[in-house]
């Protein structure tokens, strides 16, 4: 039987404890140096006097020399006053060697240890001892948008990111988005730790059991296999659950079927039943937003404004109070609707800038109760052509089907995969009759440096096609936020930033775990939904041919709500487009004069500017005015036929 070789114990110990081993080697080296020097000193001092003692070649003389060689100073106590010059020189050499090899090495070792400590803190090596922080596990293109949306929350926020991606690249992506959008990191601290999000040890090092909420992102967002992404996310979820079930966990998946399967598993598993988990399919969410945006170009603005903390949010209370009663008592927030959440408990929801505003009540105040309510919902029918086919196509088709079932108009949907020359597809579209809209989908299989390039190529072809009517409404999906303004210079009716929609939706789920079903109904309403958020013009709900005037916001809200028999409650208006600070933007693209070479620019906005570095711009949407404060203030409200209102539609 062969004897198995064992690893070298010294080498193993050295690699496990390098500083300890080096320190001890320095001590041993210095002891040997002193011992050798004392031996040389004994030989040189033979026959000479040291104090009152005559030195010789004996053990007593050696020990006396050893004692004074060990003194790390040139002060020898006078023992070498009568010694020859060679002894003094020897002592000087010994002192210099000690200073260089021992003291110098110790200083260098201490500096190395301090540098290592600084590097560990800078790179977040070791345990991050935080509490009540937000955790992002794994990293994708949604990540920078999610960090930005969390920054809009009130108060101090700490975010810890755990991913095996390069931390410098993650930091650069976050900084670039904040710089491009002109957003400041106010009261926000971001810690990036490199490690496997499914590692129990790595999760414990970020104090995940003390976290407020946890977001599990898809591994590489839209660019990898859906099955691969979802299985990786589920593995991370299982690791998190093994440590904590207290935090609110939000997980995004690619496939709606996977979402349903995990929901079923949560109901059947005792380990998952008590956990606070919200799960959604990003393709389903974005697909429905794309479809609704093509139906009404204002919907992206509605969704972003309702979901982002920039304009406030919806906050709930369990007060046993009707919406009508609450409208007479609140002025700093807007009572909006009652809604039955996941636990079947009906709550009263307010739209407010801050959560504390819903605790400010007033004495009951009488408000206007009459308005010339005249329900005449506009119905529009058109042909919707979707150029391209990706993971959102199925959700788009489902959203169009629900829209047609709600009898709000007829949308004829045609999804056209771009397998052939796009000119042939555009020729078929130009020959079709009736009103037409085009939705361009971004290619989720494109390489990172070519993101959204197919959208620009398709748009240039559309603008250059002389057979197509120039009043055709064109909508586009993009992944890269900075490409939005470049598209708008090409007169695109609506731009939907897929990653941003996912980020704002995820932010609400992280902060309001009880409202998961509410926000799902907000983005994907159907016949079974109790409420819906709709965009209506003044003439669709009111007889306002001569314009209507109300003395305050509260009067207008209460009057429409009561006059519509509590069916419609206005919560805001959609105003003019925010003005982007773009310089030297080429606003007209001459047909046939634009060609895209093999080199595709990632931020295609640079290709449409005369400047190599465009100024900072905002990627946010149109101005949305929410009526969630100053309800009693004398503030004249004028409703015109074309006034665009955001209303809560109570269907029950």
Q: Where in the sequence are the language-model features?
A:
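Cytosolic regulatory regions of ion transport systems
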Residues: 1-652
């Amino acid at each position: 039987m062969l004897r198995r070789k064992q690893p070298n114990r010294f080498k193993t110990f050295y690699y496990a404890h390098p500083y300890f081993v080096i320190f001890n080697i320095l001590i041993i080296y210095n002891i040997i140096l002193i011992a050798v020097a004392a031996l040389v000193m004994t030989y040189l001092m033979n026959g000479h006097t040291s104090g009152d003692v005559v030195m010789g070649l004996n053990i007593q003389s050696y020990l006396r020399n050893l004692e004074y060689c060990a003194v790390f100073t040139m002060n020898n106590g006078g023992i070498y006053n009568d010694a020859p010059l060679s002894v003094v020189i020897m002592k000087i050499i010994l002192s210099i060697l000690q200073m260089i090899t021992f003291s110098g090495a110790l200083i260098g070792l201490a500096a190395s240890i301090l540098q290592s400590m600084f590097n560990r803190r800078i790179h977040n090596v070791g345990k991050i001892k935080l509490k009540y922080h937000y955790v992002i596990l794994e990293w994708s293109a949604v990540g920078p948008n999610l960090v930005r949306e969390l920054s809009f929350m009130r108060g101090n926020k700490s975010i810890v990111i755990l991913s095996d991606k390069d931390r410098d690249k993650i930091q650069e992506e976050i900084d670039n988005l904040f710089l491009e959008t002109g957003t400041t990191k106010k009261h926000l601290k971001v810690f990036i730790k490199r490690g496997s999000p499914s590692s129990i040890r790595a999760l414990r090092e970020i104090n995940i059991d003390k976290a407020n909420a946890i977001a599990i992102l898809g591994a590489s967002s839209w660019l990898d296999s859906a099955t691969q992404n979802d299985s990786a996310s589920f593995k991370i979820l299982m690791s998190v659950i093994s440590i904590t079930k207290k935090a609110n966990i939000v997980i995004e998946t690619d496939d709606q079927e996977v979402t349903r399967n995990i929901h079923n598993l949560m109901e059947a598993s005792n380990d998952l039943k008590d956990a606070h988990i919200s799960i959604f399919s990003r393709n389903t969410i974005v697909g429905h937003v794309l479809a609704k945006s093509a139906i009404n170009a204002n919907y992206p603005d509605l969704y972003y404004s309702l979901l982002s903390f920039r304009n406030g949010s919806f906050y709930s209370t369990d007060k046993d109070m009707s919406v009508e009663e609450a409208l007479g008592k609140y002025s700093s927030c807007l009572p909006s609707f009652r809604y039955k959440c996941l636990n079947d408990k009906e709550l009263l929801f307010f739209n407010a800038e801050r959560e504390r505003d819903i605790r400010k009540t007033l004495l009951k105040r009488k408000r206007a109760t009459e308005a010339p309510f005249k329900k005449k919902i506009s119905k529009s029918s058109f042909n919707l052509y979707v150029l391209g086919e990706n993971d959102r196509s199925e959700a788009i088709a489902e959203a169009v089907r629900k829209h047609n079932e709600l009898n709000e108009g007829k949308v004829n949907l045609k999804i056209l995969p771009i397998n052939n020359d796009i000119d042939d597809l555009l020729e078929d579209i130009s020959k079709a009759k009736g009103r037409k809209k085009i939705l361009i989908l971004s290619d989720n299989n494109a390489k990172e440096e070519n993101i959204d390039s197919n959208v620009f190529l398709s748009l240039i072809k559309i603008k250059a096609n002389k057979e197509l009517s120039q009043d055709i409404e064109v909508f586009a999906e993009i992944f890269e936020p900075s490409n939005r303004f470049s598209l708008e210079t090409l007169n695109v009716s609506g731009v939907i930033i897929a990653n941003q929609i996912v980020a704002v939706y995820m932010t609400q789920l992280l902060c309001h775990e009880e409202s998961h079903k509410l926000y799902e109904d907000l983005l994907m309403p159907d016949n079974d939904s109790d409420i819906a958020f709709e965009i209506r013009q003044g003439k669709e709900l009111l007889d306002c041919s001569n314009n209507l005037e109300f003395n305050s916001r509260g009067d207008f809200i209460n009057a429409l709500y009561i006059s519509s028999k509590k069916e419609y409650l206005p919560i805001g208006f959609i105003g003019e487009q925010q003005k982007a600070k773009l310089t030297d933007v080429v606003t007209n693209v001459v047909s046939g004069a634009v060609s895209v070479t093999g080199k595709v620019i990632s931020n295609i906005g640079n290709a449409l500017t005369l400047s190599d570095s465009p100024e900072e711009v905002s990627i946010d949407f149109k101005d949305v005015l929410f009526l969630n404060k100053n309800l009693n203030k004398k503030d004249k409200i004028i409703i015109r036929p074309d006034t665009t209102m955001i209303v809560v539609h109570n269907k029950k």
